[in-house]
Amino acid sequence: LLDVDFGTYPFVTSSNTTAAGACTGLGIAPNKVKDVFGIFKAYTTRVGSGPFPTEDFEEAGQTMAKVGNEFGSVTGRARRCGWLDLVALKYAVQVNGVTQLYMMKGDVLSGFDTLQVCTGYNYKGQKIQHLPYNIEPENVTPIFTEMKGWKADLTGMTTYDELPQELKTYIEFIEKEV
């Protein structure tokens, strides 16, 4: 959502942050790229200002920032953290032509009793499942699906089979929705 062409203008960077933009920056023809890997966090973060419908201003967001080490490398300021926004993730997958999707930082969510996952928005009184043109907070309210959290320490787990069932369910839900 920070891309100069496909992001939430004016809260964007000055360059293209998409897979196509990477091709341009590297001087590689897009038809030479076989696979586009999409890597996302198990929760959502945003640097700086701009719309962030799933931002959590309470303890959950603070916990994600602390456990996930979500602090700027130069300023040391905490990044804005919130629940996973599948609407934004689907948009990123679509715009980038993602062929394989990888989740990271699932361990940051260990210890939460419940998790919220945004599956759509209430936009001006209507339910939608796409990013609206005007995504300002006063126009958009996230629609959350609540899921069971997990308590397990994921350190040292190296296979899918070792993961707690609640995390597997979380992953499978994302796979189904995206």
Describe the residue ranges of each PLM region.
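Non-transmembrane, aqueous-exposed alpha-helical and coiled segments at domain scale
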Residues: L1-V178
